[in-house]
């Protein structure tokens, strides 16, 4: 496929399905990471305000899980496709780093990243994956004169996905739009599929379900 697409502008959107193949649990699964918590209790700005300790423990568990999972063949295949394609952008709805560990370089995380934490005062993000960053205590930033508490650098329900201007521009200009591990029927993925189709891109849906 890399040879066929080598002179095309290719954009790939990945969803939870591609990470599930590596053992990353998703809230859609019966045994998923979210099953003991309502989404409203752990993944909204309101939850952070009402019970920071619960939200922090929840995301620390997810951050620690990153140490236990590895990229799968799909991650490596996308990195190989990128290396053979002149213009390639990978947009992921996932918050893990499996694409990067699989070799992908041009990655946009629209829902944030588990590896980074965000200063509540400045909004700046820092990679914080040291042993002391993964325990039960809150983590303080390095960017303020008086260190501030950091929050998960995640787009919670009700918040706007990151880098949407860049994402929409890339999708508008692409020749081929590939959706992997997502149904493509739920927003914002559905909106990106519609955007690609309206600009005459060739759309390919690869869903693991």
Identify what each model region corresponds to.
Residues 1-209:
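Conserved catalytic core of sirtuin-type NAD+-dependent deacylases
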């Amino acid at each position: 496929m890399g040879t066929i697409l080598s002179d095309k502008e290719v954009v790939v959107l990945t969803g939870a399905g591609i990470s599930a193949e590596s053992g990353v649990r998703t809230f859609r699964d019966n045994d998923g990471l979210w099953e003991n918590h309502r989404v409203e209790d752990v993944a909204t700005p309101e939850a952070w305000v009402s019970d920071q300790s619960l939200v922090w423990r929840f995301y620390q568990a997810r951050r620690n899980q990153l140490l236990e999972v590895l990229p799968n063949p799909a991650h490596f295949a996308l990195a190989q496709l990128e290396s053979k394609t002149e213009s390639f952008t990978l947009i992921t709805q996932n918050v893990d780093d499996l694409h990067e560990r699989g070799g992908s370089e041009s990655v946009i995380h629209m829902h944030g990243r588990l590896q980074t934490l965000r200063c509540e005062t400045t909004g700046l993000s820092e990679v914080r994956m040291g042993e002391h960053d993964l325990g039960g205590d809150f983590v303080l930033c390095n960017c303020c004169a008086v260190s501030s508490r950091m929050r998960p650098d995640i787009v919670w329900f009700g918040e706007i996905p990151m880098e949407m201007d860049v994402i929409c521009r890339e999708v508008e200009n692409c020749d081929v739009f590939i959706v992997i591990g997502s149904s493509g029927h739920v927003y914002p993925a559905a909106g990106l599929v519609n955007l690609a189709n309206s600009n005459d891109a060739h759309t390919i849906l690869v869903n693991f379900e």
